[in-house]
Each structure stands twice: as C-alpha cells, then as structure tokens.
Amino acid sequence: ACQFIDENKDRPFILYVSTFEPHSPYHGPFMDQYDPEKIPVGPAFLKKPDTASLVNRVRADYFMQFMLDGVDQTTDDYAMNYAAYREDITTEIGWRTLRAHYLANITSVDRMVGKVNQAIKDAGIEDNTIVVFTSEHGDMLGDHGMLEKRSMFEEASRVPLVIKVPWLSKKQNIIEGSVSHIDLVPTLLDLIGEPIPGHLQGKSLKPVLEGEKDLSDNDVFVSWNGYDSAVPDRFLGAHEINRMLRLPWRTIITPDRWKLALCAGDQCELYDLNNDPYEMENLFNNPEQKDRIRDMASRIRVWQVDTKDNAPLPTT
C-alpha cells in the first residue's frame, strides 16, 4: 500500500487496503502486550442470552459447553473449532486470553494504518486525500457466550467509522447517530464531485460531514440473508446452528436507539439501547412495546419495497 501511494502520488487514485486481522485465529504480533486478567469485560461476558432468538441461544450453548460442561476435546465439533481458534475456551481465563489476543490483533492493524497515513504525508498529498477507516464486522469475544459474528448484537454489528476529508475540516468531530456502510460509496462520489449512479441504494453523507444536516432521522438497516445449505460445518458449530443460520434476518436501528430484529422462523428481538446497551433483556414479547414494534416493522417493510428485498417477515 505504501509503495502504491508513492508510485501514484501524482495522479488521482483510489486504494482499498483490507487486513485479515482482527480475525480468528487471533494470533500475530503483540501477543503478550495485554494482561488477560486486566482485560475489561461487560455484564454480557459469558452470559447466555436466555431471552434472545433460538439461534443465539443455540450458539451460546454450543460455545459455553466447553467451559461449563467439560466436553471431550476429541469430539469432531470441538476439534474443528478448537483448531480454528487456536485458543483455550474451556476456562474463563482462556476466554480472557482470547480477548487479549484480539486486542493484540487490533494493535497490529493500528500500526499498519499508521504506516499508510505516514505514506500519505510523505507523498505530500495529505491535504487532498480522503481517508476512511472502518471494519466489516465486530466479534462477540465471549459476550452473550458466543464467538465471531453472525449475530445482530452490538458486539458483532456495530463498528468504528472514521472519515477524514481535509478540505472540509482540520478539526476532529464526533457525529452522533448511526449510518450504514452502504452509504460510503455515494458519500465518496459526492465528496469528489462525481455523479452518484441511480442504482446505488445508499445515500450521500456529505451534508452531514459539512454540518448542514444531522442524523436525527436516519434509520439503519442490517440484513442477514442466511447461509447456503452447501456451507460446511466448520466455524459454524453444530448442525442445528447451521440450520438456524440459513434463516434470513432483517434489523432496524432507529435514531432514538431502539433495535428490532425480525426473522420469520425464530424468536424476534427488541432492545432499548439507551437503557440496555448490552442487550440483556429482549422486549419483543412485552405487551407495552406492541405499537413500537409495529412502527419499526413497518419501516423495515418500506425499506424492503425501496430496495426490492423479498425476505419473509413475521406478522407483527
């Protein structure tokens, strides 16, 4: 990446730099930098999501059995996943060590990003280069008793987003609200004065970056289309998990920080992220939330029409 920047500094370019880390197996440099016993954890750490969807409960049962029930480590399921993670998830300190190794992965990525930024400065193009830093997904890391992604929980679906547009502002600002990755391409095209193709589903966030608009009315939608039946068991766990992961999910996060996750074949989920940021209490079956659920579900259906999405939704 640094070489590419140097070789192309005299002409317009777009450079996409992707890293495998942080990702299982969570190994790499800086493995001993973080003390597992001092790694911060929240109230959802190694706590099964008893009121959540069946797929989340089954996944938690699968991962937590290693610690709580002492499953024979020679079983096929365990052997596949243990080999993939290369971590001891049979004890709490093992889970904490896994989190420490994940942080080590992030530190490695931070160093890499620093080198790319330095290459931009060395090339003399810092003042006319847009830099975007984000991530495809997060990782459960033991929260709600799970690992990796494949969940609508915040740990898996909420990611960092940093956008540097030097000609807009030299000042660092935190913009309150939520946005979607699908908005990045329209935003970048708008920032460089290029037309936005009509087939793109996202919208430009340039007015937000310029301070002309906020995100107070910005719903964010997250979709999971389900795994194809041909996907092998490795990394997914037991056969029951694979079956449940084939079901599509549609989720909305509203500006007032409520999250509704809908699936036609599973227990749906509703969380008040203001008062329950760790998503410990699923309010979907709370009678007091019927009107809210109906409103949020209708927004998902409008989004489906706009995007020509045909995933089945439950009756709400």
Where are these regions (language model features)?
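Residue-level signal for well-ordered alpha-helical scaffold segments within enzymatic catalytic domains
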Residues: Q3, E7, R111, K115-A119, ...
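C-terminal, low-complexity/hydrophilic appendages and adjacent surface loops
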Residues: E154-E155, S223-N285, P314-T316
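Active-site-proximal cap/lid insertion segments
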Residues: F4-N128, V132-S178, L191-H199, D291
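A structural signal for well-ordered alpha-helical segments within the folded catalytic domains
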Residues: C2, A100-L103, T107-G114, A156-S157, ...
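Bilobed periplasmic-binding protein-like "clamshell/Venus-flytrap" ligand-binding domains
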Residues: D110, D219, I300-L313
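Short, solvent-exposed loop/turn segments at secondary-structure junctions
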Residues: T19-S24, G94, H137-D139, M146-L147, ...
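Polar, surface-exposed loop/tail segments
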Residues: C2, F13, E126-V132, K171-L245, ...
